């Protein structure tokens, strides 16, 4: 009889422990913010955001402000080389300045004549909206229209706003061993 009571108590304790751990796990999962599912249109819109980015950086229109408009009001851009981030360009004026290559006008951008191509785009839902990784291939470096270079990749955070999908942040992760990003044809007034 004593063994039967002990067995019943042990069984009850095990069932109770399982119930408590299941409840705790469920509560933890409910408390965490789950990524919302992205629609097919969301994926298309994020890809179009990246295509508009390529055009904005290649053509430097509206003195860089068309580029800046691709970011949220508090959005930012930076580069990263060997795990160290460079200047953080945040806010409309600073992002427009980044699009101009820190020059006074779009006529002087160091990458003038380069075409930026983005490939291998991976988009993943996140609690904030989506994250992405995309490789950068540059064509037309150093004034040679046939020179092509892999220039690392971008790590992005995208958010859906009233204006559509925008960059919350974009980090250009330079390719390992890449000393600097190559320049385009020599812009007017810029010494190489």
Feature-to-residue mapping (PLM):
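Short, low-complexity N-terminal intrinsically disordered segments enriched in polar/charged residues
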Residues: 28-73
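A beta-strand edge to alpha-helix "cap/lid" segment located at domain peripheries
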Residues: 26-40, 105-192
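A solvent-exposed, acidic/Ser-Thr-rich amphipathic alpha-helical stretch
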Residues: 64-136
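Bacterial N-terminal signal peptides that target proteins for export
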Residues: 2-13
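Bacterial N-terminal signal peptides
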Residues: 11-21
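Generic detection of long, well-ordered alpha-helical segments
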Residues: 43, 47, 89-92, 148
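Active-site micro-motifs of SAM-dependent methyltransferase domains
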Residues: 55, 77, 172
């Amino acid at each position: 009889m004593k063994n039967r009571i002990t067995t019943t108590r042990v069984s009850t304790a095990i069932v109770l422990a399982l119930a408590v751990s299941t409840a705790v796990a469920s509560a933890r999962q409910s408390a965490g913010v789950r990524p919302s599912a992205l629609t097919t249109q969301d994926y298309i819109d994020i890809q179009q955001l990246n295509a508009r980015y390529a055009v904005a950086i290649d053509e430097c229109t509206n003195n860089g402000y068309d580029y800046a408009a691709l970011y949220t009001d508090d959005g930012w851009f930076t580069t990263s080389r060997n795990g160290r981030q460079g200047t953080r360009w945040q806010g409309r004026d600073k992002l427009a300045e980044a699009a101009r290559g820190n020059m006074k006008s779009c006529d002087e951008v160091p990458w003038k004549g380069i075409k930026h191509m983005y490939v291998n785009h991976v988009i993943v839902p996140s609690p904030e909206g989506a994250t992405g990784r995309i490789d950068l291939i540059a064509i037309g470096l150093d004034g040679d229209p046939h020179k092509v270079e892999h220039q690392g990749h971008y790590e992005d955070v995208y958010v859906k706003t009233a204006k559509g999908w925008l960059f919350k942040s974009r980090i250009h992760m330079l390719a390992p061993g890449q000393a600097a990003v190559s320049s385009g044809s020599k812009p007017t007034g810029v010494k190489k």
